[in-house]
Regions:
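Active-site pre-Tyr helix/loop in NAD(P)-dependent dehydrogenases
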Residues: 24-25, 41-44, 51, 79-86, ...
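C-terminal substrate-binding subdomain of Rossmann-fold SDR/epimerase-dehydratase oxidoreductases
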Residues: 106-205
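Hydrophobic positions on the long internal alpha-helix
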Residues: 3, 7-11, 62-63, 133, ...
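Conserved cofactor-binding/catalytic machinery of classical short-chain dehydrogenase/reductase
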Residues: 2-6, 18, 44, 58-59, ...
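Conserved Rossmann-fold NAD(P)-dependent oxidoreductase catalytic core, especially the SDR/UDP-sugar
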Residues: 5-51, 75
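NAD(P)-dependent short-chain dehydrogenase/reductase
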Residues: 31-37, 64-138, 161-165
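Active-site YXXXK catalytic motif of short-chain dehydrogenase/reductase
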Residues: 52, 56
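Structural element of the ATP-grasp superfamily
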Residues: 7, 63, 100, 192-193
Length: 205
């Protein structure tokens, strides 16, 4: 948290015109399957499901406080899960698409271990689309936090099937105990779409 505060203060002291913060949809509470999309205003009352979400929410508040004082213009993007070339694919910090691609590629017996039961739902955005969303937000007059993601939602089980099909391999997932995070991620992209943003990549590509 101190890193964010120090960078924001340094930017304000340097008289920057516009400050961009990469936040996260982890600022939101956990969701149940079938629940309506959360809008940006639904981040409050605050109840992030982990410390990372709280850290991002505090960073948003720090940026907003300087913006209210007229120190700079703020642009805050809440990223959904991002994937693409050069992304982390080993070590336990990789996103689900990269982890499953690696596991399927390395499988020699037609099985892979996957945490949970496969019912958790996520949305993933390709890095090029994410960058385009950021560009549109930064160039706009929107100063409120803005979700950037896609409307393509997939369960972990469906993602396993998609990766297996793309690899042309018959894979049987072995569901094992492990951290799965929140059950569902379902967020409104109306605000970023009002700026003309539309993802061009889907998971199959």
């Amino acid at each position: 948290m101190l890193v964010n505060v120090n960078v924001v203060e340094a930017a304000a002291n340097a008289d920057v015109d516009r400050y961009f913060l990469a936040s996260s949809v982890c600022v939101y509470r956990d969701m149940e399957l079938g629940e309506a999309e959360l809008t940006e205003d639904d981040a409050y009352p605050a109840l992030p499901d982990n410390e990372y979400g709280w850290e991002k929410l505090y960073a948003e508040r720090a940026v907003a406080s300087y913006a209210r004082e007229g120190r700079f213009q703020a642009r805050i993007a809440r990223f959904q899960n991002c994937y693409g070339p050069q992304g982390t694919w080993t070590g336990g910090r990789e996103k689900a698409p990269a982890a499953l691609c690696r596991k399927v590629a390395e499988s020699t017996d037609g099985t892979i271990e996957v945490w949970g039961d496969g019912s958790a739902v996520r949305s993933f955005i390709y890095v090029d689309d994410l960058v385009e969303g950021v560009r549109r937000l930064v160039d706009s007059d929107v100063s409120d936090p803005t979700n950037i993601g896609t409307r393509e939602y997939v369960s972990v089980r469906e993602l396993v099937d998609l990766v297996s099909s793309s690899a042309e391999k018959e894979i049987t997932p072995l569901w094992v105990p492990g951290p799965v995070g929140v059950q569902n991620r379902n967020f409104s992209n109306d605000r970023i779409e009002s700026l003309g943003f539309e993802p061009t990549f889907d998971l199959v590509q």
